[in-house]
Amino acid sequence: MPRVHHSLSNQAFLVLLLFSSIASAAIVEHVLHVKDVVVTPLCKEQMIPIVNGSLPGPTINVREGDTLVVHVINKSTYNVTIHWHGVFQLKSVWMDGANMITQCPIQPSNNFTYQFDITGQEGTLLWHAHVVNLRATIHGALIIRPRSGRPYPFPKPYKEVPLIFQQWWDTDVRLLELRPAPVSDAYLINGLAGDSYPCSKNRMFNLKVVQGKTYLLRIINAALNTHLFFKIANHNVTVVAVDAVYTTPYLTDVMILTPGQTIDAILTADQPIGTYYMAIIPYFSAIGVPASPDTKPTRGLIVYEGATSSSSPTKPWMPPANDIPTAHRFSSNITSLVGGPHWTPVPRHVDEKMFITMGLGLDPCPSNAKCVGPLDQRLAGSLNNRTFMIPERISMQEAYFYNITGVYTDDFPDQPPLKFDFTKFEQHPTNSDMEMMFPERKTSVKTIRFNSTVEIVLQNTGILTPESHPMHLHGFNFYVLGYGFGNYDPIRDARKLNLFNPQMHNTVGVPPGGWVVLRFIANNPGIWLFHCHMDAHLPLGIMMAFIVQNGPTRETSLPSPPSNLPQCTRDPTIYDSRTTNVDMSY
């Protein structure tokens, strides 16, 4: 009898817990107006597309468990999608916002509503345009706090402060599609260039602090093409999360963020009352390519309460722009917070193993054209010697859902077509080397069974020049089991992989001339993009996509698309049924 009573008590407790969980969730609604607006971060007026009249765009605040509803109204002259960078999109792949992958774009004078649940995630993420180069000016912070009543796994800070780092060009964003992309004119902190640049000396981000208080810095690298070092003069910070995954607290005086990465770090105002610079500088990782000699730090200010206005700010010592050891030391020392909120152990059994080479290459110069790349060709990029071609007639997700052929091929290779000394490319290449320099152009995907564990060795190559590539996976976090330089050794290096508390990311920088080992569980059906997060490399084709098949239940299967999903084609027969079986290869 007591056992029955105990069971009933458990049932009552579970019902109460479920009710409490539902009651704590909310529907959070926003409207994003995309318009072309004139702004002047430096000396020159520039017409750019921005959201709700601000650069960066509005910060979106939610709690874990909430439903986010965002109405995007496109009043700009550009096609637009919004990607929710790092959000899992469980059962909502149609809301991922990857242009021509999960949806066709929102065309000018049109609108679309994104709606999805925030499940199993806490921390700082970002939202941004996912049409090439529009991310430069269409972006903002997405902050996910714990459910009501649940604390952070660290002492509550006095204040939370978003810091968004940006890259600025005094030119039309359409020109950024050139190969290679033009060099940026400045970097910004929360939309301000600071005192290193003309015409902006009085426009600098200021963070006012109280001595002895702690501040949670929610740091986002929204720069289009550049890794960034970040430092605060005379202050250390404690990293507590990366890519919205809690970490073992890590004390450091310098951080590096790849494009698309986020860091949550606690700053303690523990220095004498005064004024201190915070600064960012670009990290130039390309081996053999000298860093720009006129690289300027972009600065903001930490101003202590009681500081006199006449005092000169203390300057930080910044690492050299090509300081690979400092970048690697920071990136490789982060570990996950074992037992923390949403932590899960590393799966030991692996179902799919892939070895993916990555890097730059060449694309034949069109006849009657002048190309400025090496050997008078156009720059290209590839994964396993495949240059990814983005579809133009219909999104890949729709093609998959409606069984439309001719849009992509299910043949992305698990291995590169040729084994060679990946990190040391010959100065006088052989015929086979030349083949590797001119990758195949194809829209390739890799199909994975639902709930499979996938392990990927990402090997950077020295074709043209090795540089760090920030690889971003949509729809999942992945375990980063190890980093290294040189060619990955499947015996020696595999023994050193961290299977206990590896860091987890949605975006990771592959070291120049080195490798990274990733592992993730494919538990989210749909088509998910995997690509370099330097936008200059998107048109070069450093990307591929995974198709995760349906699971055994309705809850683990791909949902139908929303009725108002933007369409690329006016042909209504394509959308009649899931067995349309149209061929769009023409």
From Swiss-Prot:
Residues where Cu cation 4 binds: 469, 532, 537
UniProt: Cu cation 2 binding residues: 85, 128, 533
Organs and tissues of expression: Predominantly expressed in roots.
UniProt-listed SUPFAM superfamilies: Cupredoxins (SSF49503)
Cofactor binding notes: Binds 4 Cu cations per monomer.
Domain Plastocyanin-like: residue ranges: 33-149, 159-307, 411-552
Enzyme Commission designation: 1.10.3.2
Binding site for Cu cation 3: 130, 474, 531
Glycosylation site list: 52, 74, 79, 111, 236, 333, 385, 403, 451
Compartments (UniProt record): Secreted, Extracellular space, Apoplast
Keyword Oxidoreductase: yes
GO CC terms, sorted: apoplast
Known cofactor(s): Cu cation
Catalytic activity: 4 hydroquinone + O2 = 4 benzosemiquinone + 2 H2O
Source species, domain of life: Eukaryota
GO biological process: lignin catabolic process
Molecular function in Gene Ontology: copper ion binding; hydroquinone:oxygen oxidoreductase activity
Gene3D superfamilies tied to this protein: Cupredoxins - blue copper proteins
EC class of the enzyme, as a word: oxidoreductase
CDD domains, A to Z: CuRO_1_LCC_plant (cd13849), CuRO_2_LCC_plant (cd13875), CuRO_3_LCC_plant (cd13897)
Keyword Nucleus tagged: no
Keywords in alphabetical order: Apoplast, Copper, Glycoprotein, Lignin degradation, Metal-binding, Oxidoreductase, Repeat, Secreted, Signal
Functional note: Lignin degradation and detoxification of lignin-derived products.
Family: Belongs to the multicopper oxidase family.
Name this protein carries in UniProt: Laccase-9
Organism from which the protein derives: Arabidopsis thaliana
Lineage: Eukaryota, Viridiplantae, Streptophyta, Embryophyta, Tracheophyta
